[in-house]
Amino acid sequence: MQRSPLEKASVVSKLFFSWTRPILRKGYRQRLELSDIYQIPSVDSADNLSEKLEREWDRELASKKNPKLINALRRCFFWRFMFYGIFLYLGEVTKAVQPLLLGRIIASYDPDNKEERSIAIYLGIGLCLLFIVRTLLLHPAIFGLHHIGMQMRIAMFSLIYKKTLKLSSRVLDKISIGQLVSLLSNNLNKFDEGLALAHFVWIAPLQVALLMGLIWELLQASAFCGLGFLIVLALFQAGLGRMMMKYRDQRAGKINERLVITSEMIENIQSVKAYCWEEAMEKMIENLRQTELKLTRKAAYVRYFNSSAFFFSGFFVVFLSVLPYALIKGIILRKIFTTISFCIVLRMAVTRQFPWAVQTWYDSLGAINKIQDFLQKQEYKTLEYNLTTTEVVMENVTAFWEEGFGELFEKAKQNNNNRKTSNGDDSLFFSNFSLLGTPVLKDINFKIERGQLLAVAGSTGAGKTSLLMMIMGELEPSEGKIKHSGRISFCSQFSWIMPGTIKENIIFGVSYDEYRYRSVIKACQLEEDISKFAEKDNIVLGEGGITLSGGQRARISLARAVYKDADLYLLDSPFGYLDVLTEKEIFESCVCKLMANKTRILVTSKMEHLKKADKILILHEGSSYFYGTFSELQNLRPDFSSKLMGCDSFDQFSAERRNSILTETLRRFSLEGDAPVSWTETKKQSFKQTGEFGEKRKNSILNPINSIRKFSIVQKTPLQMNGIEEDSDEPLERRLSLVPDSEQGEAILPRISVISTGPTLQARRRQSVLNLMTHSVNQGQNIHRKTTASTRKVSLAPQANLTELDIYSRRLSQETGLEISEEINEEDLKECFFDDMESIPAVTTWNTYLRYITVHKSLIFVLIWCLVIFLAEVAASLVVLWLLGNTPLQDKGNSTHSRNNSYAVIITSTSSYYVFYIYVGVADTLLAMGFFRGLPLVHTLITVSKILHHKMLHSVLQAPMSTLNTLKAGGILNRFSKDIAILDDLLPLTIFDFIQLLLIVIGAIAVVAVLQPYIFVATVPVIVAFIMLRAYFLQTSQQLKQLESEGRSPIFTHLVTSLKGLWTLRAFGRQPYFETLFHKALNLHTANWFLYLSTLRWFQMRIEMIFVIFFIAVTFISILTTGEGEGRVGIILTLAMNIMSTLQWAVNSSIDVDSLMRSVSRVFKFIDMPTEDKPTKSTKPYKNGQLSKVMIIENSHVKKDDIWPSGGQMTVKDLTAKYTEGGNAILENISFSISPGQRVGLLGRTGSGKSTLLSAFLRLLNTEGEIQIDGVSWDSITLQQWRKAFGVIPQKVFIFSGTFRKNLDPYEQWSDQEIWKVADEVGLRSVIEQFPGKLDFVLVDGGCVLSHGHKQLMCLARSVLSKAKILLLDEPSAHLDPVTYQIIRRTLKQAFADCTVILCEHRIEAMLECQQFLVIEENKVRQYDSIQKLLNERSLFRQAISPSDRVKLFPHRNSSKCKSKPQIAALKEETEEEVHDTRL
């Protein structure tokens, strides 16, 4: 960045903002880069501002019981705020004084006041000076207030971030990431521009009082008629505003429904294409869009009438103010024109400035209160450590994740002791304790000496991670003692990578030691990986390490923990992403050798690790199942394998455990209050929803760590009756909305499921910050596209014969990615706050305007209609103004007024009252035409938005994957969320305002030019200057806004990054470093925003300066060229004053239109994307109709001769696949053939191209060569027909928000009987029947209530329903429990017995039934043969497979020889495998 010219700027340069000229000149000539932006002044740095506010807030906390954040802000910013407020008031006062001078100028043309004619020129000079003074006062004041608002936002940004790093884990479990982002964006953004309006809460009343006093002097009591009308109008607008809010709230839910489905479609676009669901998804989204648009139109109509009421209220204000006076005392032109000028200012103060000021204060105080509540949340408390101790000890430790359970625990014990004394009931305490919820850890005892290794094992949800959290101090024990030195290093289960180099991630702020660093790199097997990078360990990693594989991220996280010199190392399942060989080497070299003298606690379930551990702690349901050595474990606990593997079924849990699971699940799987569920119809009802439960569930958030043991209150306990009720003041659930907030405040969009018929259960959830920290987010990506994490679920019980409790318990142990439909993950969050600069020009091109206008043919006619109405209005206005300017004056001798009252001509003749009749008629006509003139325009523009959304949706669905791979998912979603919201909400009204203002200005100029032709000569250069100035400024301003948006992104991504690694940050004590990084991100954004505000004020000031020159010319031309008669000069000067404010408004509106039209440009860019195939008629099958000979889905009503494919024979010839056209080949010259009904297994190492081959079969990539199915080439039929020949079970399971029926049969072509039959075949019937509504049960959030196994069965059912002859399976057994895996194998044998099956699988057992194997290596087919031939001595396959796996392939060879001995085997740690970019 460059040094700012502001530092050396003179006072005059600062006053006129001339110091911004270099950046404006550069932006006009070339594209601006970040290096062109000026550095911020030191007073605006985040360090200084945050320190200042933090000092005052600490002072407030220390001095009062009820601290107020507004007091801290007042001490920091109040006096500067008031200083600029006084300047703003003085500038507004000049607006009230100007009509007085105008009246005196008009009066000087009265024939009876010829002696004052000589001072008219001086009055004109005074009037011009008032405009100059107003300009010099208002713009510095407005800029100063914007500057203060910016500083307040920066200071509170920093304060919130620092508080976030201090929050306890319990609090983080109750706060969603959406709340934090909303706190930092929606709330704090109100200070930036809203602060300039805040002063009008006192300026507007003072101004109204001053104006009413001046109008009273002119019109006496009739002045209050106009004021009364304005007050009624303000109330009317307030009513319209409330109506608009109602429609907006209703519409918000519909928008969110559409965005949920759209985001799911975008994230799973490859699956949508593989299933041929383009038409179904398009129809589903368009139906939601149709419902949304009905409410959009209603809200737009209300906003339109609200805007129109302001524009056309001026006629009635003047009319109601003047009429009573004129009826009594006659028409006085001076008073009419003076009153018109007063009423213009009065109308703005009453109907705009004061309501906006009140709204600003309401929103700002609300935001301050929210921030204040957040700043008073419970903080993370560091445990007291003994630095001299060398051992780690836990004695009788019990802990709850729920805040306050420790106090409830102690209260229950006390009550129990009291009752035992009086009643002697020993069991009472334990019954009360069961009501309080299950502890996450209970009575934990262990002791390890320095240098020992403690292995902690247990099933999912047993409390392993919670144990580490308690040692770190993240979880406070309710009772018991913890003892250790406090020098801790931590490696999280889910790898966390901060933005920076590999070296910076490993060192992480610790002093650099070359020898130690190299030793750690070697021990963690990172040498080979680092050597492959050109920059070695100085390669910069993106946020989350998106350029690394899962194994690389895991090893870097482990290296970071090992590099720190600590006494105690906490390793939470660090080997989850590593292959067996790498895991073994790292465990030996790193854990056992490099850290041999250190105390280590390793969470693992690997038998090899347990054998080498000094001590073993096995947890089961939060309790210590075993503690001792491995030999003791084998002797004392021979059944420990089941506890270790987590094979307990739900029915085997204790009654207390089952109750905790059920209530916790219901907490999180909350029911919509208005869901049409008839519980009385369900005999299997196992719970009741009470009012207390309804309130509690609103605040529930899934925490995978303690999901089984968290407590949910269904009924009030005795302790609650005594007033001990937890979380009674917790704020209601809030989410981050994808829809831009309106000017009235933020819109919190409720999560509403897709509409369906029949009994439904609608569910919603949100993600807590703690959940974000503990998510296993899969970060697989391809060379062009970063995909969103797929959802992974782990089952607690077998997948068949489930009870209703089992169904709901599936929600507990899931490991799910943060979905964009609910909360936005870090990559999508970045996308949602700025758009890529891409190829969109800085200024919207005329071609975009032309295309927009011609989208809907009627739009052109509507614009012509508006122009015709405008011409009629101008003509009517000319008639009235001509009458006022040329009304014959009454003879002085017949005047009823004395000399003292004749400052202006008075028209009292009865015949002259026709002026009023004409004025009333014209006013009524203008009101009618004005109110309804723009309505067709707004209606048509919303229709245009509807058409553009439809075209863009169709274009995205039909676009090839090679094009979609070059786009980011967040960017695509932005088009459907932010840009469509702009087209729906902002653009129609902004275009209407601009056209309205432009026509008003043109009309006023036309009237002035008719009355005084000389003025027209001065108007032409002014208009030219405006156009040139606008073009000059627009080039730079749009670029600065783009840079500002881009600079906003790091703020929020840094917040999410910090939250995901918060436990690591605290363990390493790196909070100050991350605060510094956050301040740098704030300063970067501030530099762009401050420069944008400065250039905007430069532009606004230049506009006023041009107009001041114009007004000076108009004033002197009218004064010097006008003869007798005050009417004409009054009209000219009044209209000139009106032109000033209106033209500025029009120019600003034109800039807004240009900015909003950039959204239209982006939408057109998506519409213009290439399509996969030429448009063809729908190939949707009909159950009772004959189809063409090229058939896709087999149908019992169709003759066999018409069915294709009939056998499933495939021939692949010279197949080459590329991700993008012209890119490197991923597969080269693949040739082989598959016989009908044959089963082929794909073999190869990770990244060899197995999943890519399956994608190539579906033509999802750029392909060359030929594939034939039953003799039909893929070039001879459409893509839809080709893809429907395949059944697909993808690696990334796709469950969209909708009913079971919709997910299984989106085209609604099968009957319930047929769907149930298939559900029986795949083992889903027992699962679906447990849900209320059965097939009509609404699944949300990617099927959050289903395990991963259930979702795989859903995909299997889809393939069975499709009756495809070729089945593609991409890692179908990944993360499946044995029961579901057996169901899939059985279904493949039965339902697909005569189908061709192509299987990509890592499990050797899954390959047993394949007749042929295709070995892929280095993107080519190396071998294609039977398993027997592949296992010969020369085979590459034989070299890759271990001897034990060979035995598994042929178990019959050894089964008869000897009976295998029972062995104790451990299940692999339940973590997500790395998902590759080529997955289906």
Curated annotation (Swiss-Prot):
Record keywords: ATP-binding, Cell membrane, Chloride, Chloride channel, Endoplasmic reticulum, Endosome, Glycoprotein, Ion channel, Ion transport, Isomerase, Isopeptide bond, Lipoprotein, Membrane, Nucleotide-binding, Nucleus, Palmitate, Phosphoprotein, Repeat, Transmembrane, Transmembrane helix, Transport, Ubl conjugation
Topology class, membrane: Multi-pass membrane protein
E.C. number(s) listed in UniProt: 5.6.1.6
ABC transmembrane type-1 domain span: 81-365, 859-1155
Lipidation (S-palmitoyl cysteine): 524, 1395
Motif (PDZ-binding): 1478-1480
UniProt PTM comment: N-glycosylated.
Modified residues (Phosphothreonine): 717
GO cellular component annotations of the record: apical plasma membrane; chloride channel complex; cytosol; early endosome; early endosome membrane; endoplasmic reticulum membrane; membrane; nucleus
Organism domain of life: Eukaryota
Ribosomal protein as UniProt keyword: no
Extracellular face residues: 99-122, 217-222, 320-339, 880-918, 1012-1013, 1117-1130
Modified residue annotations for Phosphoserine: 549, 660, 670, 686, 700, 712, 737, 753, 768, 790, 795, 813, 1444, 1456
UniProt catalytic activity: ATP + H2O + closed Cl(-) channel = ADP + phosphate + open Cl(-) channel; chloride(in) = chloride(out); hydrogencarbonate(in) = hydrogencarbonate(out); ATP + H2O = ADP + phosphate + H(+)
A Pfam family recorded for this sequence: ABC_membrane
Cross-link (Glycyl lysine isopeptide (Lys-Gly) (interchain with G-Cter in ubiquitin)): 688
Described function: Epithelial ion channel that plays an important role in the regulation of epithelial ion and water transport and fluid homeostasis. Mediates the transport of chloride ions across the cell membrane. Possesses an intrinsic ATPase activity and utilizes ATP to gate its channel; the passive flow of anions through the channel is gated by cycles of ATP binding and hydrolysis by the ATP-binding domains. The ion channel is also permeable to HCO(3)(-); selectivity depends on the extracellular chloride concentration.
Family: Belongs to the ABC transporter superfamily. ABCC family. CFTR transporter (TC 3.A.1.202) subfamily.
Domain notes: Binds and hydrolyzes ATP via the two cytoplasmic ABC transporter nucleotide-binding domains. The two ATP-binding domains interact with each other, forming a head-to-tail dimer. Normal ATPase activity requires interaction between the two domains. The first ABC transporter nucleotide-binding domain has no ATPase activity by itself. The PDZ-binding motif mediates interactions with GOPC and with the SLC4A7, NHERF1/EBP50 complex.
Subunit structure: Monomer; does not require oligomerization for channel activity. May form oligomers in the membrane. Interacts with SLC26A3, SLC26A6 and NHERF1. Interacts with SHANK2. Interacts with MYO6. Interacts (via C-terminus) with GOPC (via PDZ domain); this promotes CFTR internalization and thereby decreases channel activity. Interacts with SLC4A7 through NHERF1. Found in a complex with MYO5B and RAB11A. Interacts with ANO1. Interacts with SLC26A8. Interacts with AHCYL1; the interaction increases CFTR activity. Interacts with CSE1L.
Identification of the protein by name: Cystic fibrosis transmembrane conductance regulator
Species in which this protein is naturally found: Gorilla gorilla gorilla
